Amino acid sequence: MKFFVDTADTQDIADLAATGLIDGVTTNPSLIAKSGRPFAEVIAEICALTDGPVSAEVVAIDFDGMMREGRKLAKIADNVTVKLPLTLEGLKACKALTSDGIDVNVTLCFSANQALLAAKAGATFISPFIGRLDDIHIDGMELIQEIRQIYDNYMFETEILAASIRSPNHVRLCALAGADVMTAPPAVIRSLVSHPLTDKGLETFLADAKKAGIEV
């Protein structure tokens, strides 16, 4: 499973990219607004920090506006993936942009039917929102499993990009359910490495090495 980081903080992206564990980045207008910087400037800087896909979202909701903004975003860098909302206008724009060779991430997916439509529209990625489904007491992981089965049944190439990831347990369950990609905030990705027994074991090893005077 590929790991994308969900942030517009370029320092966080640079730090995580240096680990070699990050395969791409997802952003949205809300995340970029927090930076207080011009939209295109932030996207360009992020694209320079990773070779992987960088999702940049349109703010238009009509077909012509999405096409205009999508083409503008795609010109920022070769690794930009245009992020579109899961609406009929968004799916129409998805079909048109992907036909032109532009990668598209269809976002705000909350049902298997929506995911099926996105795949038929040629989406590069579909982003089901796990945490937001949990908020309304619907099992987001069941949705991942349903999408996985449908895509496998019909050999769709659209990748399942699990979003709204809020905990290490979400990451584990997405991997078990067959998500191709998960995107999570930097804090969640960093928390994946932690385990109390790892910390305890390391503490013991270091104490024993110091006691024995071991140097490498």
Curated annotation (Swiss-Prot):
<dbReference type="InterPro" id="IPR018225">
    <property type="entry name" value="Transaldolase_AS"/>
</dbReference>
<keyword id="KW-0704">Schiff base</keyword>
<dbReference type="InterPro" id="IPR022999">
    <property type="entry name" value="Transaldolase_3B"/>
</dbReference>
<dbReference type="GO" id="GO:0016832">
    <property type="term" value="F:aldehyde-lyase activity"/>
</dbReference>
<dbReference type="GO" id="GO:0005737">
    <property type="term" value="C:cytoplasm"/>
</dbReference>
<dbReference type="InterPro" id="IPR013785">
    <property type="entry name" value="Aldolase_TIM"/>
</dbReference>
<dbReference type="InterPro" id="IPR004731">
    <property type="entry name" value="Transaldolase_3B/F6P_aldolase"/>
</dbReference>
<keyword id="KW-0570">Pentose shunt</keyword>
<keyword id="KW-0808">Transferase</keyword>
<comment type="similarity">
    <text>Belongs to the transaldolase family. Type 3B subfamily.</text>
</comment>
<dbReference type="GO" id="GO:0004801">
    <property type="term" value="F:transaldolase activity"/>
</dbReference>
<feature type="active site" description="Schiff-base intermediate with substrate">
    <location>
        <position position="83"/>
    </location>
</feature>
<protein>
    <recommendedName>
        <fullName>Probable transaldolase</fullName>
        <ecNumber>2.2.1.2</ecNumber>
    </recommendedName>
</protein>
<dbReference type="InterPro" id="IPR001585">
    <property type="entry name" value="TAL/FSA"/>
</dbReference>
<comment type="function">
    <text>Transaldolase is important for the balance of metabolites in the pentose-phosphate pathway.</text>
</comment>
<keyword id="KW-0963">Cytoplasm</keyword>
<dbReference type="InterPro" id="IPR033919">
    <property type="entry name" value="TSA/FSA_arc/bac"/>
</dbReference>
<dbReference type="Pfam" id="PF00923">
    <property type="entry name" value="TAL_FSA"/>
</dbReference>
<dbReference type="GO" id="GO:0005975">
    <property type="term" value="P:carbohydrate metabolic process"/>
</dbReference>
<comment type="pathway">
    <text>Carbohydrate degradation; pentose phosphate pathway; D-glyceraldehyde 3-phosphate and beta-D-fructose 6-phosphate from D-ribose 5-phosphate and D-xylulose 5-phosphate (non-oxidative stage): step 2/3.</text>
</comment>
<dbReference type="GO" id="GO:0006098">
    <property type="term" value="P:pentose-phosphate shunt"/>
</dbReference>
